[in-house]
Amino acid sequence: MNNRLYGNLIFELSKPGRRGYSLPKNEFGHHEVPAEMRRCEDAKLPECDELTVVRHYTNLSANNFGVNNGFYPLGSCTMKYNPIINEEIAALPQFAALHPLQPEDTCQGALQVYYDMQKALSAITGLEEFTLNPFAGAHGELTGLMVIRAYHQSRGDLKRTKVIVPDSAHGTNPASAAVCGLEIVEVKSTAQGVVDVNDLRGLLDDTVAAVMMTNPNTLGLFERKIPEIQKLVHECGGLMYYDGANLNPMLGVCRPGDMGFDVMHINLHKTFSTPHGGGGPGSGPVGVRKGLEQFLPVPKVEKVGDRYRIVTTNGQDFSVHVGEFFGNYAVMLRAYTYILTLGKEHIRMVGPLATLNANYIKEALKDVYELPIPTVCKHEFVFNGLKDKSTGVTTMDVAKRLLDYGYHAPTIYFPLLFHEAMMIEPTENESKETLDEFIAVLRKIAEEAKTNPEEVKTAPHNTPTGRVDDVLAAKQPILTWKQLSN
């Protein structure tokens, strides 16, 4: 590897006057940018030749890690394989060249895909209607809460401003509620890791707008008392919100709508194999039960006879608006391709296989890693670090050492219920051979913690970047080249 190209920022490879491009001949005449719109000084951009740029970014990409590189057991993230067919379909010019303002008659096929995706999600979740407008999972979560707020406002029930979330909830739950102008109230978990119904009962009154739940929850445990919980919430006039972050193990097993949830969002990048990360694009469809459809944002697509039309109003004073046009259409298209590829028969296998894989790893390692809640899990589970605490090897050390063996680390120190949390989620894609290899490596690290703890505590040793100073990075974040150059 050329360390000069890898170890420096692209700005540090810049040489004045060096060019990697050429401009075409000007065939449109000379048109100056108005003086008031011109820069006062040159843009601070790197000047590099094409080969340097290609080598630099190729080296960077080779030192990244993704699902296509290897096993990625990042708990609560559902890092499943994104089939290439998804990308091929999304790249078809019939879809890629669409414009959101073109006439309905010229994009009937695209509108049909949008409509069919709405119906597919309804069938999978048991909810009446979906909007595909939200641009990310957290955006969908916010949209769902806005729907709930609009519902209560339409009834003149303005004092319902509280949202109850479990202490094991995803961080986006309280964050979305706060952004929506709602007050967050925390409900405790039992020693078994599920919602404490007695504690919840004491929190319910006529100020509660909704209860947000993830099922299975963040510990990978199924909330068995949902029937009782939803009855209590509905009796007090609140709504049930389903955080679709952990929908994957539910596929083929049960549906949120059938359990009594009123509103939910789905993370397409988790359950339906669209790309993770990179800052977007994302998609967070929101579904509602019958009776709440009028509060969903527009535009939406409806079918009239054999034609599809765009509906831009729902005729409500309390409508929700979250973005222009149809959300991230290409992301939705990838997810719909995944659904069609699996079909009804195989999509029913997703949940059971994800659950089987998680329990297989858990049972194989519980003698060397502490299992705080020893019960059957769903798609993921949480260890509380090594069973033998005398070595001084932490969850962070184990995670760093895993990098040396070519695995991405699991989610660590979340949920906050355990001091040395290590959350592992294998997804349904992984073979038994992959799981066995991963188990063997974690057992080897547990043995290293006893025989050579310093090797583990100073890991990683085989990666291009060694152990970084997390505390310094948090205290003195340098996020741009300008900060570094100053």
Residue spans for each PLM region:
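Non-catalytic terminal extensions of PLP-dependent enzymes
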Residues: 1-129, 254, 304-326, 332, ...
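Single, functionally critical "micro-switch" positions that shape active/binding sites
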Residues: 74, 136, 242
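Conserved PLP-enzyme active-site core in the AAT-like
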Residues: 109, 139-306, 392-393, 420
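A short, small-residue-rich loop immediately preceding and capping a beta-strand
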Residues: 128-134, 162-165
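General small-molecule cofactor/ligand-binding pocket signal
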Residues: 131, 185-187, 410
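Hydrophobic alpha-helical membrane segments of integral membrane proteins
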Residues: 133, 273-274, 350-351
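Short strand-loop junctions, especially beta-strand C-caps/beta-turns
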Residues: 135, 190, 214-216, 384-386, ...
